[in-house]
Amino acid sequence: MRRNILIIISFLTLLVSSGCTNLDEKWYSEVTPDTYFTSKETVYSFLVRSFTHWRWFHGFDRAILQECTTDEMCVTQKGIHYNDVRYSQLQHHDWTPLHPNNEETWRGVGMGVAMALACKEDLSGVDYVSLGMTEELKADHQMQLQTLVAYFYLRGLDFYGGMPIYRRSTTEEVPRSTARETFNYVEELLLAAIPKLEKKRADMLEEGYLRQGTAAALLAQLYFNAEVYMGENRFAECAQVCQDLLDGKYGYYELEEDWFGPFTFDNNKSKEVMWSVQSQYAKGTLFQWQFERYNHYNAKNYFDLSGYSSTNGMHLQPSLKPNGDPYTDKLGRPF
């Protein structure tokens, strides 16, 4: 019996000693491109982060700044929610730089530029071939990120006029440029990117990435608003880019036969859609809070929308007085 006990003790000692490994952690002070980019998957996970910010940027802050400052739309008080008079400030044009919707939009533009520039610089040093990809794909990724930089500067130009122009990723502050300088920078980025981006073919799906046609459409937007941005008429250039799009110069695009083409749940197959965001939320729950913003306070009850809440919905400003007579104001009358 004693011999058996000794054998068991010896066996357990051997088991414990063989199971002891060095569990000391190896600490890294930082994650660098050399340690992170080890596969095709890590490259794409890094690339799409700039695109997820682009998706976030299409939020209510941007919509309300564009609509509630136009004298056509407003958010009136229904119920207890007034949100610290933020909607009234937009209505009467007396907002401050720290107005929540304004602050988030300024931050969103800068964050988008910073992300895209940093991603472009880090991916420029990655050996795509060693990870099973091509140099052509690398060049395409570089131009997609450059187009994202142009997109965010275009949005900043539209909201604020001249923006601080960054050409590389840096923590140093740069002074604010003029609207014309910002316009020229956006144009420069897009003109350089368009010929190097991939063209859409008829068999391609829209999966959120950037192609020639999308960058060309952004350039057309830039030219269309040039007179407002900097007092220069660029309608001829805008018309030419649009005609080139219709003629297929920048890839395969066609107008759909009916409304459901670009707005159905499988619109990634649409011939008309040029840039879209992938979503698995087929019931629209991903953006339900945005839908609430455009409905009446009790719309959820009328439509039996489970999970929706009551919100002060944005609506057209009234064009008629309570007695039915039209208002005489020159602004603020949608019809």
Segments predicted by a language model, with ranges:
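Short strand->helix junction
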Residues: 172-173, 229
